[in-house]
UniProtKB/Swiss-Prot annotation:
This is Uncharacterized protein YpzA. The gene is ypzA. Pfam families: DUF2564 (PF10819). It comes from Bacillus subtilis (strain 168). InterPro entries: Uncharacterised_YpzA (IPR020314). It comes from the Bacteria.
Amino acid sequence: MTSEFHNEDQTGFTDKRQLELAVETAQKTTGAATRGQSKTLVDSAYQAIEDARELSQSEELAALDDPEFVKQQQQLLDDSEHQLDEFKE
């Protein structure tokens, strides 16, 4: 049994799926913040982006040796952050 499968058994999600969900959460929170024009939601969106960034830099994801996947997820986070920055101006 590899550590990836062992980890999946314990958490229910693979590390890649956890990152995907974190990025989706950041994107949805960003969308809600810009539509609702709420400072609280904007702050929450920035926090969701930061949390997803931290997850994207985890040792577990680095061990998967799929840098293209991580780069793609980080680009989605950059896009969300840019959207928030534009909204704040």
